[in-house]
From Swiss-Prot:
Protein name according to UniProt: Aspartate--tRNA ligase
Coiled-coil ranges from the UniProt annotation: none
HAMAP family in alphabetical order: Asp_tRNA_synth_type1 (MF_00044)
High-level lineage: Bacteria, Pseudomonadati, Pseudomonadota, Gammaproteobacteria, Enterobacterales
Any single biological process term in GO: aspartyl-tRNA aminoacylation
Family annotation (Pfam families): GAD, tRNA-synt_2, tRNA_anti-codon
Assembly mode: Homodimer.
InterPro entries reported in the protein's UniProt record: Aa-tRNA-synt_II, aa-tRNA-synth_II, aa-tRNA-synth_II/BPL/LPL, Asp-tRNA-ligase_1, Asp-tRNA-ligase_1_N, Asp/Asn-tRNA-synth_IIb, AspRS_core, GAD-like_sf
A Gene Ontology term for the protein's cellular component: cytoplasm
Places the protein is found: Cytoplasm
Amino acid sequence: MRTEYCGQLRLSHVGQQVTLCGWVNRRRDLGSLIFIDMRDREGIVQVFFDPDRADALKLASELRNEFCIQVTGTVRARDEKNINRDMATGEIEVLASSLTIINRADVLPLDSNHVNTEEARLKYRYLDLRRPEMAQRLKTRAKITSLVRRFMDDHGFLDIETPMLTKATPEGARDYLVPSRVHKGKFYALPQSPQLFKQLLMMSGFDRYYQIVKCFRDEDLRADRQPEFTQIDVETSFMTAPQVREVMEALVRHLWLEVKGVDLGDFPVMTFAEAERRYGSDKPDLRNPMELTDVADLLKSVEFAVFAGPANDLKGRVAALRVPGGASLTRKQIDEYGNFVKIYGAKGLAYIKVNERAKGLEGINSPVAKFLNAEIIEAILDRTAAQDGDMIFFGADNKKIVADAMGALRLKVGKDLGLTDESKWAPLWVIDFPMFEDDGEGGLTAMHHPFTSPKDMTAAELKAAPENAVANAYDMVINGYEVGGGSVRIHNGDMQQTVFGILGINEEEQREKFGFLLDALKYGTPPHAGLAFGLDRLTMLLTGTDNIRDVIAFPKTTAAACLMTEAPSFANPTALAELSIQVVKKAENN
């Protein structure tokens, strides 16, 4: 039906007769001449109709936005004064000789000249996807997956599919369950990841595996989360953690070079402890130059319980954040930041405004200065390298609250004051995570998942002191986003059962949920390690959007609903009966 794409016409096509298919993006009727911007997935080209082709001109008068049409005409160079430098096709236009209206369009529920609500965009997603910026994002996503496949093929990885209907295993979130008609009362689970299957593939001897795969998690959603999401899933045998990181770093550098023309360079490596200490986060945004500085040792003897309490508590922390130029902040802005840190459990926000250091106490402004002597204040200013015009904020509480609150404040202030260089790319690896974390009920939970190997510990040592265990795990972080994470896996049955025991999974439950894995570990399991990237998040970064729904063709809302198809929906009673399922209405509270 067509010979060329609209957006691919250039000066090299001048004089050629072309047939185009697409949509009317805009129409301008000048009476004796009608111009339209015609759009397809590759872009927009200007088409005009003149009186010498009367039939085509007459039919063109009926055109409206989003009519689906076919145009045949001749490519012409535009006059110099009419060249549109903002369009890829701006040096040419098409003089139409014939026009076919393939399909007319009703008045659109979306307005291309205004910002539409996200609800409307999701309800009429098929229209929203016609927008050039949306089409470009999905084209970029397709390019990314193509680049990944070629890279992985070139590096000896095999693309192997794993099951979608599998067994429920605890991986940190709720499973989506699928009832079995054949096995009454039993359920499959949609995979949260192919974790165990890819480990079993290593035990099968496939050595290098990858898959671009859908995963499912029934969890409370955020702006950057979806109930179904896509992973670039990778597993390797006989490779150390640094070797895995080297190959995966090469993949991501390849993507940035091909898609953005940017060489990311070598990725720095930082331990979890260092990231938390310096940035208050295990996914630090290194485009932001500000760092947290520990000052507890300077404040142990002050008569100010807000500082002295955490300073003398082994589980406490007092951290300072120097904000360059922050002395210009108003009291209202400071109060807003104080309320902001309360979201993260902090009780408030102490500060010192550094107006003129040379004047000592007279050169600062601080509600807590009366609790601190000149010597302590000077020591704090020295340690934070404070200069005239700076602001120093303080966080004082238990270590987690200080890290969470001050880490979040660092990001917010960096953005608000323009201190974060958003023109840069700042990748890094974060390694050496704690293996376990407190579950809040006196037990331990796996920080990553229960199949991660500890670093340099035997099963007996791990059992004796699990709180000291460091996971042989690694996350890739770019501009403050965790884009991928992985670990060296447990390849020894005793170690795996020890980890299960620490997590409170008794032997009976181990056999019930993981018997197949424990059996497989008996038969010469190779050491193996892997990683998974979030394709949606990678694409979000590479396309410059801050909303993950912009890079998914048909995403769900934050309530895990599809506004277009109205999923989820009630099931047919007959289908439920075949599955031996009865829906019980929840009693309403009176």
